[in-house]
Amino acid sequence: MTTRKRPLALLILDGWGYRENTQKNAVYHANTPVLDRLNAQYPNSLISGSGLDVGLPDGQMGNSEVGHINIGSGRIVYQELTRIGKAIEDGEFDKNQALVESIDKAIANQGAVHIMGLLSPGGVHSHESHIEAMCRLAVARGAKQVYLHAFLDGRDTPPRSAKGSLAHFDDLFTTLGTGRVASVIGRYYAMDRDNRWDRVSQAYELITEGKSLHQYSNAVEALEAAYARDENDEFVGSSAILDAQGDSAQLADGDALIFMNFRADRARQITRSFVDADFDGFERNVTPKAHFVMLTEYAADIKAAIAYPSTNLVNTLGEALQDSDKTQLRISETEKYAHVTFFFNGGKEEPFKGEDRILIQSPKVATYDLQPEMSSAELTDKLVEAIESTKYDVIICNYPNGDMVGHTGSFDAAVKACEAVDTCIGRVVDALAKVDGECLITADHGNAEQMTDEQTGQAHTAHTSELVPLIYVGRNGSIENDGRLSDLAPTMLTLMGEEVPSEMTGRSIIKLDE
């Protein structure tokens, strides 16, 4: 006989921040009767999901990976942006074994050092200061051929903001006396994470064959031509930057290829195309035997050198639930599935004992403003079914809409996205009430609450540093002020009457009435 559970659900509304300014604030302007009612009826507060409170530099906007690691681990986890920045500052970066060995092997082979990554000051997937340090290191160790393959942002930065970065690196290579920007392509292609291999193949062929839609003599010219085609940074078509002889820089046997993204989810697919022997995402015309380095570990089964291996997080929420013989469900759409599983578990791929997972396919559309509801209805169908089954003690669910639609820059679509999520929350809360369950409703970071950049007038497609909501739909009580994401796991364990592991430095911020 199956024991009936009283589930505690954590609903993470991705990209759903709180902002006083209501101008182009999709969260404010959306018709959200369910959340309005819950805010009026239940304990609620605002908590921090950015900057020092999540292990990022002061003032740095939060992001989904960082948010879920902090939530799931119950502690402030110092992020790779901070960790690698510090290594550069104190000189440790220049001695990093994986980086140094790859450069030295390429030089010994009379080969080239290829550096690829998101060329952006956004700090979400990469930081251009890290890429600059890598270029400087390659030249300092004697590399005569240094090629930068620039993936352009426009999601975590304004849609047309790459010119300054490309111009800076042109100047940098002039100063260094060698090296150049060798190719330019939007992250839409190079950093897909939804198995749209036709996109990734364009970046792969650009780097390995020099195959491109466009050819230019310098990177800024390539960008200006893209803007003339009405392509924002994110969507810049494959552009080879040719040398004085009209040749493109192509990855060859014996070269080094160093991937400077530190965030895993959007780095995995293109990495697999370079390193997996049995890769079948698309037909590869060439497979250069290069020395590939991942800046961080993108997945446990990817066989490549790692410059900065993951720090081991023990006694995360998932592990604590396992040790207490509790059952748990992780559920989301494709776009945020890795966040409620891999990242929430502190970078561990394998499920814990008693942990089930449900993946709902995200819709196959070019950009999510075309379908702002995404797959939220189907996700909620499965979530309600899981709640009604009373199989699970804890359910972790992410609704991606606020973030994924917020990134498109479309205010009207972001409003629709928020409204779709509100409808779904109503169904979930009703289902929980029927089984005497409870839930916490929160967000990992902001996005949809600011859809216009007030300084430039451009669409605001990036995350924000705003506080995020926290609502407790359950017993009578109150929520303490000054909470942060790392307080959620200790709070959940306390609500369940479970012991909080000593490794969790967050605190329980919900006080139940006597």
From Swiss-Prot:
GO molecular function: manganese ion binding; phosphoglycerate mutase activity
Entry EC no(s): 5.4.2.12
Class in the EC hierarchy, top level: isomerase
Superkingdom of origin: Bacteria
Cofactor: Mn(2+)
Family classification: Belongs to the BPG-independent phosphoglycerate mutase family.
Name of the protein described by the UniProt record: 2,3-bisphosphoglycerate-independent phosphoglycerate mutase
Originating organism: Shewanella sediminis (strain HAW-EB3)
